[in-house]
Structures are given as structure tokens and as C-alpha cells.
């Protein structure tokens, strides 16, 4: 008995006691075929580069298959989520999927066993047709059962790891896709001259409606004025610019043209003493020159004589 326990026999193998096992563990030796191997024998057991490459290829192939499986499960989950987002009814008075009205005046309805919602017969699937009492499922619950069956979630009691497919822009089946808003192009700033002309034209249209009578009365005087170099009384803006495209607003006259020309001629005769000389800035607006009388050179005819005083002009 003792020989059997302590291993005195040559051919019998006896399990050593704990003390010997602890000692051999500290010495890094054990009861195996590799116990007395030399360093040379251990070096021969190293893997060659070809063997390492083959092992790495197997591991990489397993990883690729795992990624493909996760993508496959992700497509199933994405399809299920899309069906859940596209529901159109409330599941009570309307079909949960298509939104069709249910009841006496509408389509016949069935009751889903899993989600407890009402659907029409077109959107429902009969799960157990052979039984006396048929079992109905909506398409969403039927798809969910299919996902659990094809992904192995029924075995793991939950969905395994999956990878959702990437949403590419412009997909027709993506209801939440919206194109990015394009930024409006910046408008080129208008020049100061163009804006000034437009503002003047708008004011011109407004003023032309109210001052039509004044424009008509002053049109005869304006035709007699020279085209260039004539300015108004204040001298800040010309009557016509050199380009001829822009005109300053016209000032209306309260007195008739004939009466005004007479007043101006009287004032001119009072200042200069004679009516033959023109003012330094040219002829005044509204003043008409006539040929002098043959007998008296340099003097205006009697018809152009002004009234005695300026009070008659103001009256």
C-alpha cells in the first residue's frame, strides 16, 4: 500500500502529494513529458513564419466573418426600425400600419397578440392557421420575431452585437433625408451713382403727380433757357447736367410767366440803368431779348417797359 502511494514501482504513475507539487512549482518543473527537455528541444518547438502567417490569416478571416454577420443583423434591425417609423394609424380606430379606418363602416380588424394593437386584415399575418382560434400578428411584430430568429437572439436572450448600415445621402427609402440648404449668393453692391439715380427717380414720380400744374407752367420758360451753365437762384444744383441723363427737380412758379418776366426786366433795368447790357452770368431766366429799335440803338422797345416800381410785381 505504501509502495503504491509513494511510487516505489517503476511502471506505475502516482500523483504526488501537495508538498512535492508546491516544491516542483517553485522550481518550475512538473510531472510531464516536457519536464526534462533541454533548451535546444524547446527552441525547435517555436512556430515558423509560414505557420504564424497561416494562423493570422485564419484569425483575420474569422474577424471578417464576424463583421459581415454584424452587418447582416444591422440590416435586419434597420428594416424593423424603418417599419416602426412609418406607422400611420393609432391602432385603436385606425389600422396601425396603413391608417385605414376600422369598424362597421370601415374594414374588418384583427387583434395583434404581441403589441395588442388593431390592424386590418391586409396588414395582419395569421401565425397559426391550423388552430381553431387563429393567432394574428401585425407585420411589425412578425418582423421582430423574424429578427430574433435569424440573429440568434432567441438563444442569447437578447440581440447580439450589430452594425447599422451607413445612410448614404440621396437614398429614396430614407424619410428623414433632407438636402442641405444652399447659401444664397451675395448680391453685388450697387454704385452710389446708380442708387442716387434710383432714389431721385422714385421721388420724381411722386412729385410729378402733385406738381403737374407747376411743370406745365414752367415748361415754356425752360425751353428758352440755355442747355448748359444755367443754375438756380441758390446756385447749388444745375438745371441740366452735362450728360443730359439726370435732371434736377423743377421748381414751380406761382405767378404767370408773362408777369414774372416783366418783374425781372424791371429789376434788371433798375440795377444797371440800361436794358441793353446782360447780367454777368448770362441772361436771367424768363427774360427775352428783342432786337433794338432802329432809331434808338441799345434801348428796348416800349412794349418791354416794366411798371414803375417793384410793388406792382409783388402785388
UniProtKB/Swiss-Prot annotation:
The tissues where this chain's protein is expressed are given as: Moderate to high levels of expression in thyroid, ovary, stomach, heart, pancreas, skeletal muscle, kidney and liver. Also detected in epithelial cells.
Q: Where in the cell is it found?
A: Cytoplasm; Cytoplasmic vesicle, Secretory vesicle membrane
Q: Which BP terms in the Gene Ontology apply to this protein?
A: calcium-dependent activation of synaptic vesicle fusion; exocytosis; G protein-coupled receptor signaling pathway; glucose homeostasis; intracellular protein transport; negative regulation of G protein-coupled receptor signaling pathway; positive regulation of calcium ion-dependent exocytosis; positive regulation of insulin secretion
Where are the annotated segments for Disordered? 170-315
Residue positions binding Zn(2+) 2: 112, 115, 138, 141
The answer to whether keyword Zinc-finger applies is yes
Task: Please note every region of biased composition (Low complexity).
Answer: 298-315
Alphabetical keyword list: Cytoplasm, Cytoplasmic vesicle, Exocytosis, Membrane, Metal-binding, Zinc, Zinc-finger
Q: Which GO terms describe its cellular component?
A: cytoplasm; presynapse; synapse; transport vesicle membrane
Q: Which residue intervals define the domain RabBD in the entry?
A: 41-158
Q: List the disulfide bonds.
A: none
Q: Name one GO molecular function term.
A: zinc ion binding
Which InterPro entries is this protein grouped with?
FYVE_2, Noc2_FYVE, Rab_BD, Rabphilin/DOC2/Noc2, Znf_FYVE-rel, Znf_FYVE_PHD, Znf_RING/FYVE/PHD
**Quick check: keyword Metal-binding in the entry?**
yes
SUPFAM superfamilies linked to this entry: FYVE/PHD zinc finger
* Residue ranges covered by zinc fingers (FYVE-type): 89-146
Q: Where does Zn(2+) 1 bind?
A: 95, 98, 120, 123
Biased composition, class Polar residues, residue ranges: 262-275
**CDD domains cross-referenced by the UniProt entry:** FYVE_RPH3L (cd15763)
Q: Where is the composition biased (Basic and acidic residues)?
A: 184-193, 221-240
Main localization is cytoplasm
Functionally, this protein is described as follows: Rab GTPase effector involved in the late steps of regulated exocytosis, both in endocrine and exocrine cells. Acts as a potential RAB3B effector protein in epithelial cells.
Assembly with partners or alone: Recruited to dense-core vesicles through specific interaction with RAB27A in endocrine cells. Interacts with RAB3A, RAB3B, RAB3C and RAB3D. Interacts with ZYX.
Regarding domains, what does the record say? The N-terminus of the RabBD domain is necessary and sufficient for interaction with RAB27A.
Question: Which PANTHER family does UniProt cross-reference here?
Answer: RAB EFFECTOR NOC2 (PTHR45729:SF4), RABPHILIN, ISOFORM A (PTHR45729)
Write the protein's name.
Answer: Rab effector Noc2
Protein species of origin? Homo sapiens
Amino acid at each position: 500500500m505504501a509502495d503504491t502511494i509513494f511510487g516505489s514501482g517503476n511502471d506505475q504513475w502516482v500523483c504526488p502529494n501537495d508538498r512535492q507539487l508546491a516544491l516542483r512549482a517553485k522550481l518550475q518543473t512538473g510531472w510531464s513529458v516536457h519536464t526534462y527537455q533541454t533548451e535546444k528541444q524547446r527552441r525547435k518547438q517555436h512556430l515558423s513564419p509560414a505557420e504564424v502567417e497561416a494562423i493570422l490569416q485564419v484569425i483575420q478571416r474569422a474577424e471578417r466573418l464576424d463583421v459581415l454577420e454584424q452587418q447582416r443583423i444591422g440590416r435586419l434591425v434597420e428594416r424593423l426600425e424603418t417599419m416602426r417609423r412609418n406607422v400611420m394609424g393609432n391602432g385603436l380606430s385606425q389600422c396601425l400600419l396603413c391608417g385605414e379606418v376600422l369598424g362597421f363602416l370601415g374594414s374588418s380588424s384583427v387583434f395583434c397578440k404581441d403589441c395588442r394593437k388593431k390592424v386590418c386584415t391586409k396588414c395582419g399575418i395569421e401565425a397559426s392557421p391550423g388552430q381553431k382560434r387563429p393567432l394574428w400578428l401585425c407585420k411589425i411584430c412578425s418582423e421582430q420575431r423574424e429578427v430574433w430568429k435569424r440573429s440568434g437572439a432567441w438563444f442569447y436572450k437578447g440581440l447580439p452585437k450589430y452594425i447599422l448600415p451607413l445612410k448614404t445621402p440621396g437614398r429614396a427609402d430614407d424619410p428623414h433625408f433632407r438636402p442641405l440648404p444652399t447659401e444664397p449668393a451675395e448680391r453685388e453692391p450697387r454704385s452710389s451713382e446708380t442708387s442716387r439715380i434710383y432714389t431721385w427717380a422714385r421721388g420724381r414720380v411722386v412729385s410729378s403727380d402733385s406738381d403737374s400744374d407747376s411743370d406745365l407752367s414752367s415748361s415754356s420758360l425752360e425751353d428758352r433757357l440755355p442747355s448748359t451753365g444755367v443754375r438756380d437762384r441758390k446756385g447749388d444744383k444745375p438745371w441740366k447736367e452735362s450728360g443730359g441723363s439726370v435732371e434736377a427737380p423743377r421748381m414751380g412758379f406761382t405767378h404767370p410767366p408773362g408777369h414774372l418776366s416783366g418783374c425781372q426786366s424791371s429789376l434788371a433795368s433798375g440795377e444797371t440803368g440800361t436794358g441793353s447790357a446782360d447780367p454777368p452770368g448770362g441772361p436771367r431766366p424768363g427774360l427775352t431779348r428783342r432786337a433794338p429799335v432802329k432809331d434808338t440803338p441799345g434801348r428796348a422797345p416800349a412794349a418791354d417797359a416794366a411798371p414803375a416800381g417793384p410793388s406792382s410785381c409783388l402785388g
